Amino acid sequence: MDHSAARLDPSAHARQPWRIHDIANDFRLEDVWALPSRGGPDDFPRLVSLIQSLDPGDSPLAVRALFVVRWQLGALLGLDRGETGLDARVDSLRTRLPEELAADTGLTFPESLPFRPVYVTDREAAFEIANTAVHAVMHLGWVPDGDGGY
């Protein structure tokens, strides 16, 4: 089994019965990646927990430097003002959720990451970010890899 990340054709995402297709159907799909992970059919919550716990402050120096530059440019250009984000410039995707997905996810992110959880199921999760430049979604899905893993 190949343990490296691989960019996929967007049709790989479109073929899945993801809930995100209905919730964010007016968003443009930028790219799709297969990321190596260990686990079985019930291990998606572990991946979500890992994503939730990411902190740029724990990253290598080069990654931390990129975050510092990004936040400084954002402050200089006014990209991240509160009035340009979620529930200000744009409504959260949570307002589009069907009742069965609308329950509080219980997830939070460190202040250093500007993502907000939209929904989590047993095999997919969506997180959103909004500022002056973008309203974007990070969607994670748990798909069998064909080699007994996910």
Language model: regions and residue ranges:
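Short, hydrophobic/aromatic-rich segments at coil-to-beta transitions
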Residues: V120-F127
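Heme-based O2/NO sensor domains and their adjacent alpha-helical segments
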Residues: A103-Y119
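Beta-strand/loop substructures that line and gate deep hydrophobic ligand-binding cavities in soluble
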Residues: N131-Y150
